[in-house]
Structures are given as structure tokens and as C-alpha cells.
């Protein structure tokens, strides 16, 4: 189950990075 949590954390970081990237591009 620890592996599952690692996957969730990894997906969360990737999603957060993608959203931040889109917001930054939208502001430019």
C-alpha cells in the first residue's frame, strides 16, 4: 500500500506541475 501512496503523490505532483504550467502560459 505504500507503493500506492507513492503513485498518488507522484501523480499529484505531476498534475500540480501541469496546472501551474498552464496557468503561467495563460497569463503570458
Swiss-Prot record:
Disulphide bonds in the chain: none
Subcellular location(s) per record: Secreted
Tissue expression profile of the protein: Expressed by the skin glands.
Highest taxon above the source species: Eukaryota
Key word 4Fe-4S present: no
Gene Ontology terms: biological process: defense response to bacterium; defense response to fungus; killing of cells of another organism
Positions annotated as propeptide: 27-28
Keyword Secreted set for record: yes
Keywords in alphabetical order: Amidation, Amphibian defense peptide, Antibiotic, Antimicrobial, Cleavage on pair of basic residues, Fungicide, Hemagglutinin, Secreted
One GO CC term on file: extracellular region
Modified residues (Glutamine amide): 25
Coiled-coil regions listed: none
Main location: secreted
Summary of the function given for this chain in its UniProt record: Has antimicrobial activity against Gram-negative bacterium E.coli (MIC=13.32 uM), against Gram-positive bacterium S.aureus (MIC=13.32 uM) and against fungus C.albicans (MIC=13.32 uM). At higher concentrations also has a bactericidal and fungicidal effect. Has hemagglutinating activity against horse erythrocytes.
Family that this chain belongs to: Belongs to the frog skin active peptide (FSAP) family. Cruzioseptin subfamily.
Name of the protein: Cruzioseptin-3
Species of origin: Cruziohyla calcarifer
Lineage: Eukaryota, Metazoa, Chordata, Craniata, Vertebrata
